[in-house]
UniProtKB/Swiss-Prot annotation:
Listed name of the protein: Elongation factor 2
GO annotations of cellular component type: cytosol; ribonucleoprotein complex
Database matches in NCBIfam families: aEF-2 (TIGR00490), small_GTP (TIGR00231)
MF terms (GO), sorted A to Z: GTP binding; GTPase activity; translation elongation factor activity
Organism: Methanococcoides methylutens
Superkingdom of origin: Archaea
Main subcellular location: cytoplasm
Subcellular location: Cytoplasm
SMART domains on file: EFG_C, EFG_IV
Family in the record: Belongs to the TRAFAC class translation factor GTPase superfamily. Classic translation factor GTPase family. EF-G/EF-2 subfamily.
Entry-annotated residues carrying Diphthamide: 596
Length: 730
């Protein structure tokens, strides 16, 4: 314990000097070696035994992670590294690589300033590598590259020294091509990765060695010698001469920014307040004496302390007993404990200053994405946008009736811990529905509810979440209130694709300054008048108030928009969420007495006008698609392609490398249930595969009636497809 205590003392001493801090994440495709790399960095810092590093998987502290051999949650740790006779504090987050847990990566990107991108030298860049790199660049997080498993290239693929350099060069070029394509401005500012400069390291996380150009200069070990050591399988000597933690941490400290350098650039990307005054200025310089600005990026449950909110502290300092405001909460919260993480352990400290990643208890109203501040009325941070959407749903029931109240509380907790999970109560059937990123995601959550929360549950087989949208235009359609005194006239049409995409990416929101929003909408192809009159955005749908001078509309607008949101959450065709719908209010007639235009009158009138108009505008269903990447020996290629084509899938591209074929394809999520077992059988267990969410595509016309009827029946609605008249009968 003495060693750990000493480490805590060193960590706390360095916390208050942001120049000496690096907040970083390790990101990669699944099984490319992130957690093994993290272990060796910790061993180098003296936090775990060197003999166990790479096998202990210290960061995978969850029982399920160890069983499945994958990282499911992001794990945080603070450690100290000495570079050029100075001590630095590295706050490290190890993230999951499986596509179903990509939400953890997105949230981690908000907390860090730099990322070590890990790529398997044999497999090269894979779909999830591209996804995590895109998320990093979107949040203005600077990447450096670690090419792992170089020993496999030499010993398994038997490449010679020259071919190895060519292959590694190609891999680096490909990463740079991705960086340039995703953020050219940053690429031109020197964010490209370059072996000669030192922003690329090569090595083996399993055998604990790594080399980079600065490391070669420091140790005198040449690339040729590395090759010879690997051929002789003398990894031990290589690990002693070129320890992995030294090469990687030196690269992190030399090239990734400190909070002072990073925040000046990043604050404008993640916060839309005034950067020239008050808290904006304080965040830009990570001012520990300024007002508190803390963003929650993760929530976990501690059996003793309750909810632990982890996040990035941009300005001010956190200490016990502070009273703080949480965005969206009515009353202030009081901070109970502040601490830092050492893998699975949370260690209490007295105070944490700006520029650090902190773990706090007492924020009962916080959710992931909350802004926590001492400044009442501070404009909140931009919400965290996830690359994927929940597309698979299961119904959850408690096995024993006595557990029902506990299940309701447990579901509230898991939704708070994992914001990519959507929990809803189906009013018709009384079932709790749990929507997640994929089969594995929901399996893990269900297992945790039973294991950690102690509630036995049963779940239905997974079903797909569709999207309702319109392909035509309709209106003006009249919606009447039950008392006949209020009428709304709406037009619906498809929302411009570019506008929809910008909303989905978080580039356009109702939170941003009006002028900036208007300019972006016009640039995306919206009519000037419409851009000026946008009244609400919900998911990827928008509402426009095109009326002029209607009395009492201002005070009624909130209720009108409530009707809009209700329909966008559950469309008229099958009560599935809507996407890409533009609703325009063209005219309204309102009763002059407020008593006659209350919620019970206005909401149904607003809602029914939109529902009827959507059914007139060719309301249809879109289904979620995933890209499927398969690596298989050539002789198994036929089995793999047949497996995709038999699931309404399309082969997009096929490339060969040696005797391996890489198939890029896409298929509907509804057809991919059970794919893992089937592809294993079809290729005799020799295929490696991964998926990536690519969005929604139209459901084939010949399937619409059957699918809609099935959804309606499942939800306890009339099986027959609804007609516009059903909503206009009032």
């Amino acid at each position: 314990m003495g060693r750990r205590k000493k480490m805590v003392e060193r960590v706390t001493a360095l916390m208050s000097n942001p120049v000496m801090i690096r907040n970083i994440a390790i990101i990669a495709h699944i099984d490319h070696g992130k957690t093994t790399l993290s272990d060796n960095l910790l061993a180098g810092a003296g936090m775990i035994s060197k003999d166990l590093a790479g096998r202990q998987l210290f960061m995978d502290s969850d029982e399920e992670e160890q069983e499945r051999g994958i990282t499911i949650d992001s794990a945080n740790v603070s450690m100290v590294h000495e570079f050029e006779d100075e001590e630095y504090l590295i706050n490290l987050i190890d993230t999951p690589g499986h596509v179903d847990f990509g939400g953890d990566v997105t949230r981690a990107m908000r907390a860090v300033d730099g990322a070590v991108v890990v790529i398997d030298a044999v497999e090269g860049t894979m779909p999830q590598t591209e996804t995590v790199l895109r998320q990093a660049l979107k949040e203005h997080v600077r990447p450096v590259l670690f090419i792992n498993k170089v020993d496999r290239l030499i010993n398994e693929l038997q490449v010679d020294a020259q071919e190895m350099q060519i292959r590694l060069g190609k891999l680096i070029d490909h990463v740079n091509k991705l960086i340039k394509g995703m953020n050219e401005e940053r690429y031109n500012q020197g964010w490209r990765v370059d072996a000669a400069e030192g922003t690329v390291a090569f090595g083996s996380a399993l055998y604990n060695w790594a080399i980079s150009v600065p490391m070669m200069q420091k140790t005198g070990v040449s690339f040729g010698e590395v090759f010879d050591y690997c051929r002789a399988e003398d990894m031990k000597s290589l690990g002693e001469k070129c320890p992995l933690h030294e090469a990687v941490n030196d690269m992190v400290i030399r090239f990734l920014p400190s909070p002072i350098d990073a925040q000046e650039d990043r604050v404008g990307v993640i916060w839309h307040g005034d950067l020239e005054a008050g808290i904006g200025k304080q965040m830009a310089v990570a001012d520990a004496t300024g007002d508190l600005a803390f963003m929650v990026t993760d929530i976990s449950m501690d059996p003793h302390a309750g909810e632990v909110s982890t996040g990035r502290l941009f300005s001010g300092s956190l200490s016990r007993g502070m009273e703080v405001y949480v965005s969206g909460a009515a009353k202030p919260n009081r901070i109970q404990q502040v601490g830092v993480f050492m893998g699975p352990e949370r260690l209490e400290v007295d105070k944490i200053p700006a520029g650090n990643i902190a773990a706090v208890t007492g924020l009962r109203d916080a959710i992931v994405g909350s802004t926590v501040t001492t400044l009442d009325g501070m404009s909140p941070f931009e919400s965290i946008r996830h690359a994927s959407e929940p597309v698979v749903t299961v119904a959850v029931e408690a096995k024993h009736m006595k557990d029902l109240p506990k299940l309701v509380e447990v579901l509230r907790q898991v939704a708070k811990e994992d914001p990519t999970l959507k929990i809803t109560l189906d009013e018709e059937t009384g079932e709790h529905l749990m929507a997640g990123m994929g089969e594995l995601h929901l399996e893990v959550i269900a297992h945790r509810i039973e294991r950690d929360k102690g509630v036995e549950i049963s779940t239905t087989p997974p079903i797909v979440v569709y999207r309702e949208t319109i392909t035509g235009t309709a209106g003006p359609v009249e919606g009447k209130s039950p008392n006949r005194h209020n009428r709304f006239y709406v037009v619906v049409e498809p929302l411009e694709p570019e506008v929809r995409e910008l909303i989905r990416e978080g580039e356009i929101s109702m939170r941003m300054p009006e002028l900036e929003r208007r300019e972006k909408l016009i640039a995306a192809g919206l009519d000037k008048d419409e851009a000026k009159r946008i009244a609400d955005i919900f998911e990827s749908n928008a509402y426009f108030d095109m009326t002029k001078g209607i009395q009492h509309l201002n005070e009624t607008m909130e209720l009108v928009l409530e009707g809009f949101v209700e329909v966008m959450k559950a469309g008229p065709l099958s009560k599935e969420p809507c996407m890409g719908v533009k609703v325009k209010l063209m005219d309204a007639k309102l009763h002059e007495d407020a008593v006659h235009r209350g919620p019970a009158q206005v909401i149904p009138a607003s809602r029914q006008a939109i529902q009827a108009a959507m059914l007139m505008a060719d309301d249809t269903l879109f289904e979620p698609y995933q890209k499927v990447f398969i690596q298989t020996p050539q002789e198994q290629m036929g089995g793999a392609t047949k497996e995709i084509q038999g699931r309404r899938g399309i082969i997009i591209d096929m490339t060969s490398e040696g005797d391996t074929t890489i198939i890029e394809s896409k298929a509907p999520v509804s057809e991919l249930f059970g794919f893992a077992g089937d592809i294993r059988s079809a290729t005799e267990g020799r295929a490696m595969w991964s998926t990536e969410f690519v969005g929604f595509e139209p459901l084939p016309t010949n399937m619409i009636t059957e699918v809609v009827s099935g959804i309606r029946e499942r939800k306890g609605l009339k099986k027959d497809l609804p007609q516009a008249q059903d909503f206009m009968s009032m």
